[in-house]
Amino acid sequence: MAEDIKTKIKNYKTAPFDSRFPNQNQTKNCWQNYLDFHRCEKAMTAKGGDVSVCEWYRRVYKSLCPVSWVSAWDDRIAEGTFPGKI
């Protein structure tokens, strides 16, 4: 169990620097990567392509965004009340 956690920590990669968001506050970066992931996933699904190319965006928003925000946004997408353009 402890070895598994050590392996996860060792292999964990955080979000890389994005020059569009140079400030300390990364809220907009979180939001943009969440939108980009869902847009990419929607576009690749429509084309019949492989959605694994969108995985980078998912890793970045999972690294930056609080879990409560992501779950709330996922709920809003499911309800059809999400404010962002996907």
From Swiss-Prot:
Occurrences of domain CHCH (ranges): 27-73
Pathway: Energy metabolism; oxidative phosphorylation
N-acetylalanine modification, residue list: A2
Extent of motif Cx9C motif: 30-40
Principal cellular location given in the protein's record: mitochondrion
GO cellular component: mitochondrial inner membrane; mitochondrion; respiratory chain complex IV
Disulfide bonds, paired cysteine numbers: C30-C65, C40-C54
Compartment(s): Mitochondrion inner membrane
Membrane association type: Peripheral membrane protein
Modified-residue entries (N6-acetyllysine), positions: K62
Residue ranges of the motif Cx10C motif: 54-65
Pfam families: COX6B
Xref: InterPro entries: COX6B-like, CX6/COA6-like_sf, Cyt_c_oxidase_su6B
Keywords noted in UniProt: Acetylation, Disulfide bond, Membrane, Mitochondrion, Mitochondrion inner membrane
Superkingdom: Eukaryota
Family: Belongs to the cytochrome c oxidase subunit 6B family.
PANTHER family listed in its UniProt record: CYTOCHROME C OXIDASE SUBUNIT 6B (PTHR11387)
Described function: Component of the cytochrome c oxidase, the last enzyme in the mitochondrial electron transport chain which drives oxidative phosphorylation. The respiratory chain contains 3 multisubunit complexes succinate dehydrogenase (complex II, CII), ubiquinol-cytochrome c oxidoreductase (cytochrome b-c1 complex, complex III, CIII) and cytochrome c oxidase (complex IV, CIV), that cooperate to transfer electrons derived from NADH and succinate to molecular oxygen, creating an electrochemical gradient over the inner membrane that drives transmembrane transport and the ATP synthase.
Subunit and interaction comment: Component of the cytochrome c oxidase (complex IV, CIV), a multisubunit enzyme composed of 14 subunits. The complex is composed of a catalytic core of 3 subunits MT-CO1, MT-CO2 and MT-CO3, encoded in the mitochondrial DNA, and 11 supernumerary subunits COX4I, COX5A, COX5B, COX6A, COX6B, COX6C, COX7A, COX7B, COX7C, COX8 and NDUFA4, which are encoded in the nuclear genome.
Protein name: Cytochrome c oxidase subunit 6B1
Annotated organism of origin: Mus musculus
